[in-house]
């Protein structure tokens, strides 16, 4: 016979977010809520109804915003963690395409999303929305599919008279991580361009700016590093050709040869930047760009004022 005691307990459904707070030794023993505390039980059920209404309102708002791309959300999205994880992975691509099509720079990321830079993923370029087959904006899968060089495609379209843009400007530079054979992330440089007719971004992977200059994409200016080896000083004019009486026949560096350290001259950023600035470039920001091998025309490169690279 079942017990008819007034102090007997019954099971009260808990909020999914509160289920993980139950201790393990209570999983098969007495629940927490008792029938004597009907007021607390009623408040708990009221809170659950409010939460369900809140979730339904959020789902309705998302359904109205995204149209039919997102199915109706569950009343409790975290009720089953496995289903929620599968739900999020299944609809991630649809949501990404939708956000990309909202506007020109909605969620495309420029030039690489910061989260993707931290994560080091290499599929960020292929996650863009799929454009029409006759659109050669070169952003998304058209720029990397089949490893076709973007410059060749652009020149071919312009040669055939199918290019509806009149200017190609450099938008800036970015970096993308590739996993090498040793499992180490190798960062390669990007030159991101804008097509004047489309307004879409053109991605061009280049290991250095010299190759882009050789293809005619950069101004013809010498941006190659100059020699940083110490140069002999010009002879100083003297009034007498006789040697100094206290000058030794053999200097100290011949008695105790000091091996020259190339890292002290070549890999010293201060000396390298100073010589590059003095002989090759005009201002300090051009020197820094030439030093790191990233050429960005100042009149076409835009970035936030407090995050300038110079």
Swiss-Prot record:
How changing residue 159 to A affects the protein?
A: Almost complete loss of interaction with host DDB1
Q: What InterPro entries does the record point to?
A: HHV5_RL1
Indicate the impact reported for residue 152 to A: No effect on the interaction with host DDB1
Q: What outcome follows a substitution of residue 157 to A?
A: Almost complete loss of interaction with host DDB1
Per the record, where are the segments of Basic and acidic residues compositional bias?
Answer: 35-44
Question: Could you tell me where the Polar residues compositional bias lies?
Answer: 1-12
Into which family does the record put it? Belongs to the HHV-5 HKLF1 family.
Describe its partners and assembly state: Interacts with host adaptor protein DDB1; this interaction allows RL1 to recruit the cullin4-RING E3 ubiquitin ligase (CRL4) complex and promote SLN11 degradation.
Report what the protein is called. Answer: Protein RL1
Species of the source: Human cytomegalovirus (strain Merlin) (HHV-5)
């Amino acid at each position: 016979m079942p017990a008819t005691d007034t102090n007997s307990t019954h099971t009260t459904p808990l909020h999914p977010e509160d289920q993980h707070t139950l201790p393990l030794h209570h999983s098969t023993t007495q629940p927490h809520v008792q029938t004597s505390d009907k007021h607390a039980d009623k408040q708990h059920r009221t809170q659950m109804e409010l939460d369900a209404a809140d979730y339904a309102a959020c789902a309705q708002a998302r359904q109205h915003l995204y149209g039919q791309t997102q199915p109706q959300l569950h009343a409790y999205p975290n009720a089953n963690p496995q289903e929620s994880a599968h739900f999020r992975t299944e609809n991630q691509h649809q949501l990404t395409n939708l956000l990309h099509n909202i506007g020109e720079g909605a969620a495309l990321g420029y030039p690489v999303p910061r989260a993707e830079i931290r994560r080091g993923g290499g599929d960020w370029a292929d996650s863009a929305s799929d454009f029409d087959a006759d659109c050669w904006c070169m952003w998304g899968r058209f720029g990397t599919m089949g490893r076709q060089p973007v410059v060749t495609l652009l020149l071919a379209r312009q040669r055939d008279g199918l290019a509806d843009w009149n200017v190609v400007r450099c938008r800036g530079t970015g970096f993308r991580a590739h996993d090498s054979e040793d499992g180490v992330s190798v960062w390669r440089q990007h030159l991101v361009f804008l097509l004047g007719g489309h307004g879409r971004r053109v991605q061009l992977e280049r290991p250095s700016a010299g190759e882009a200059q050789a293809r005619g994409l950069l101004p013809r200016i010498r941006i190659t590093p100059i020699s940083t080896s110490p140069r002999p000083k010009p002879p100083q004019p003297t009034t007498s050709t006789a040697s100094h009486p206290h000058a030794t026949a053999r200097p100290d560096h011949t008695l105790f040869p000091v091996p020259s350290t190339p890292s002290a001259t070549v890999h010293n950023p201060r000396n390298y930047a100073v010589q590059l600035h003095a002989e090759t470039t005009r201002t300090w920001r051009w020197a820094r760009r030439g030093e790191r091998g990233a050429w960005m025309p100042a009149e076409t490169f835009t970035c936030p004022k407090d995050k300038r690279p110079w």
